[in-house]
């Protein structure tokens, strides 16, 4: 019989996750303040950098920072039981992935049978099980999303399992989650789908257009 030894999170707010985040100047910023505690929680940020805004009910911070630099701010999370605070640093420059990425990858669960519905169900589980409140944020689509052939202009497209990856990315971002995708440097992926060989820059532009993080 499965059992859980991890103690339940307290009713009072507790801010979790990394204390630093990297982003490039002018790039889209997305970060959900990870916090546990009895719902509803209310989120506030002191010294929020210009160009960013925080949703006080979801804790999702979005926007763009134009200028390079180190930005220190204070996260504040409140509920009817208490308050928690934490100093948080954003490094705006060329340094990304300043902490180990935390998230989910489709391969071990779904292999080549991953599709849009299964991805979204897994994302909902990330939220409903509280992983997002502990700093888990990436939803990564592994192999099996690619169409059988490119468009006439060489652009890579998704197959029928993912009708619109741009909309999928937008859906994930609205939940405060980040969008990851699999690619291969060879002509084909391990699963026999399209690789990025001789289309590396073109595919990278497509991923950016879809909102891949």
Role assignments for model-derived ranges:
Residues 50-67:
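Strand-loop-strand motifs at the edges of beta-sheets in extracellular beta-sandwich domains
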Residues 1-13:
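Proline/serine/threonine-rich low-complexity linkers at boundaries of modular beta-sandwich domains
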